[in-house]
Amino acid sequence: MASKGLPLYLATLLTGLLECIGFAGVLFGWTSLLFVFKAENYFSEPCEQDCLLQSNVTGPSDLKAQDEKFSLIFTLASFMNNFMTFPTGYIFDRFKTTVARLIAIFFYTCATIIIAFTSANTAMLLFLAMPMLAVGGILFLITNLQIGNLFGKHRSTIITLYNGAFDSSSAVFLVIKLLYEQGISLRSSFIFMSVCSVWHIARTFLLMPKGHIPYPLPPNYSYGLCSRFGASKKENKAAEHETKELRSKECLPPKEENSGPEQQQQQEQQQQQQQQQEQHEQHSFRRCALSRRFILHVVWLSIIQLWHYLFIGTLNSLLTKLSGGDKVEVSAYTNAFAITQFFGVLCAPWNGLLMDRLKQKYQKAAKRTGSSSEAVALCSMVPSLALTSLLSLGFALCASIPVMQLQYATFILQVVSRSFLYGCNAAFLTLAFPSEHFGKLFGLVMALSAIVSLLQFPLFKVSPESNAVYVSMGLAIFLTLVHPFLVYRECRAEKTKSSVDA
């Protein structure tokens, strides 16, 4: 990392962290916002009509139509949050950072303005606004993940930190709920969020690149405000060429790097030509997307994510059932859940630190054995993948026990496992596949997992009345341990191959 650009890099890092923690993943604070919507009588007409027909007989069934509408909104929004990542990931890869961020700002601003001016009479507009909010938020995250490239060996830590900040941003809706209870209207809160778009625009042009942040980072790399007053286009093109050279050198086995100057030059030229051909064949987007490694990762993410979405979407109904309809207790537990979400930003970096430390350890071993950098990266992912599956399994087991006080432990396991899940997902795609396909692969894995997430709505009709769904999800999560096991076998096979070649 160049010391000259350090202040700019830190400014980009910190403002990106603020953007993710304050805006990107607010959708997942749905439980807190739902409490406000219910207080404002959104979708309450069907319930009132049912109550009149039943001669003032009230109970959980009276609110089912209202809960189903809210569940459907969250299902659609969470689906769009994931599914639209594929086309937006393509836009990010094809049209670069500035265009992607301007699209994100447009969707996000429109969504917050629509929510600000909704009421009980226009509650149907939430079916439009919440998906738009989700799409804008995920695009903020995608464009910020590349900031990890500025910090070299700390790359995984930064990526997981940003994913943790994405998780923590769900606490924003808790703040809106608390402000609402103090007399500040929902409209005022969302108008303030709309005005913040000015800050997003300023950051886009001053602290973010027009294109992509390369990895490895070339010397004298500049972007944003500095590129407008410093480096020229020719210098930036030279930096891109230098990045390609650095990337090709990283792929060289250690024993070939130590040969004589003339032989090394010839070998490098030959190997660069071979690598370009091999990378085109072996690392094409189609080849990556159809690989067993990618397919297993999609299954791993889809199952665990479905459980998280189902839990968030049904939490209000679950708490109402366990508390016997006590609104004060439901509010207290809703606040507790939202507060735990904020600590996702503190949990996620531990996963990144684990990956970075293991990667450094395996790199030292690779210098002795001649293992490829790809094998080293995969080895560093195995413990994180396994730990994420185990945490999610514990979360599912706690949630399946119908004891109100135990839900505090459930909330803690939920936030830790969720922050590990998305950090692990982004880091795995970054380390296990070529960086030029990251946007498309990240989008594809989220789009495919989004299709699976649509199951949460039919499951919602079962879960409040039965624990069978929780038990089934627990068994499915247990099976996700197959993914880290097969990645481990792949690493072992690569190590064996390297030792035989040596």
From Swiss-Prot:
- What UniProt keywords apply to this chain's record, in alphabetical order? Cell membrane, Glycoprotein, Lipid transport, Membrane, Transmembrane, Transmembrane helix, Transport
One GO biological process term:
hypoxanthine transport
Q: Does the keyword Membrane apply?
A: yes
Cite a GO CC annotation: basolateral plasma membrane
Question: What domain of life does the native source organism fall in?
Answer: Eukaryota
Q: Which InterPro entries match?
A: MFS, MFS_trans_sf, SLC43A3
UniProt feature, compositional bias: Basic and acidic residues: 237-258
Q: What is its main location?
A: membrane
Glycosylation sites recorded in the entry for this protein: 56, 220
Q: How does it sit in the membrane?
A: Multi-pass membrane protein
What is this protein's tissue specificity according to the annotation?
A: High expression in the heart, followed by the lung, liver, spleen and kidney. Highly expressed in adipose tissue.
Induction description = Induced during the differentiation of adipocytes.
Regions that span the bilayer: 17-37, 72-92, 97-117, 122-142, 156-176, 189-209, 294-314, 335-355, 381-401, 419-439, 442-462, 468-488
Q: Where is the sequence biased in composition, kind Low complexity?
A: 262-277
**GO MF terms on file?**
adenine transmembrane transporter activity; fatty acid transmembrane transporter activity; guanine transmembrane transporter activity; xenobiotic transmembrane transporter activity
**Reactions that this protein is recorded to catalyse:** adenine(out) = adenine(in); guanine(out) = guanine(in); hypoxanthine(out) = hypoxanthine(in)
Region (Disordered), start-end ranges: 237-280
**Key word Glycoprotein present in the record?**
yes
Compartments in which it is found: Basolateral cell membrane
Q: Which family does it belong to?
A: Belongs to the SLC43A transporter (TC 2.A.1.44) family.
Query: What is the documented function of this protein?
Result: Sodium-independent purine-selective nucleobase transporter which mediates the equilibrative transport of extracellular purine nucleobases such as adenine, guanine and hypoxanthine. May regulate fatty acid (FA) transport in adipocytes, acting as a positive regulator of FA efflux and as a negative regulator of FA uptake.
The name of this protein is: Equilibrative nucleobase transporter 1
